[in-house]
């Protein structure tokens, strides 16, 4: 790391997160260095003056100014469903990513992360990770974690649209309707059901799944949040435990050269794979992680849900190996791809 006076200090990455492209570094120095205070994100207002600090195009430390253009922007960076950002018109160019976005008192408002641009340069639409979430990165780093862990909701939902508000007897487009719940979901455990409308987390309005996940992430794993929701016409509030995604002893396998689909990498289903590939929580089968050459030529793709081999349902690695081993000449594989059931036939 290069300091403002030109000195270089080495450091190590102690925590990182691919989803947000953010990391925590530990500098190899005993010197007490200047630091920024974190601004409470819910106090940031649209129109507020901010400064973006970075090293655009490698020209050196640069400061640009602008305002907060918007709050609660979601699904911006690489189409991330987990993204939740502050929007600014302060010029942000390649090299500014990871730089500080500060207010006029010098407090950290956010960390610059991305821009929307057709040319690759600044068009006045930049985004920053809110300081509240940055603070959780620091907390987890101090706890000894090496990768950032978000609380697991085990729930899917969708924002309330204008067309949905009237039939649901809602006064405005606010909240999100629960469309699916995992059997182990902490929301399900407190009695929240499909069709309920979640309106607040810890008293703060939410309008999308990404906003709810952000509120949960800021609260942190191991805590509780108050979830306010509408159920059967009544407003209720329940305390929900914030937990990690269940980590069962799941099995996976890369098929060997003696089997008919060498290099095919399949795994039993987990909540992580269901979330990553957008599969319903009720899905059954094996997830394809890598096709290998032969299965790829047959038409399999990474992310396919392998459900039947030669007409036999498969949910475990043992069932898959047994079904594959029983194939003598002609065979078939049934997969689910983006909700479509597809049968692939082959001959040995």
Give names to the regions the model predicted.
Residues 36-39, 86-102, 181-187, 291-298:
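Gly/Ser-rich catalytic serine loop of serine hydrolases
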Residues 18-21, 339-340:
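Short acidic/glycine-enriched loop/turn segments that link adjacent beta-strands
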Residues 21-27, 88:
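A generic structural motif
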Residues 2, 12-14, 31-59, 93, ...:
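Active-site substrate-binding loop(s) of clan PA
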Residues 33, 53-66, 72-98, 103-141, ...:
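Active-site loop architecture of trypsin-fold serine endopeptidases
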Residues 1-4, 15-19, 53-57, 73-74, ...:
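Beta-strand-rich soluble domains of envelope-associated proteins
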Residues 8-13, 26-27, 45-48, 108, ...:
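C-terminal recognition in membrane/secretory proteostasis and scaffolding
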Residues 3, 8, 63, 103, ...:
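Short, acidic, Ser/Thr-enriched surface-loop or helix-capping motifs
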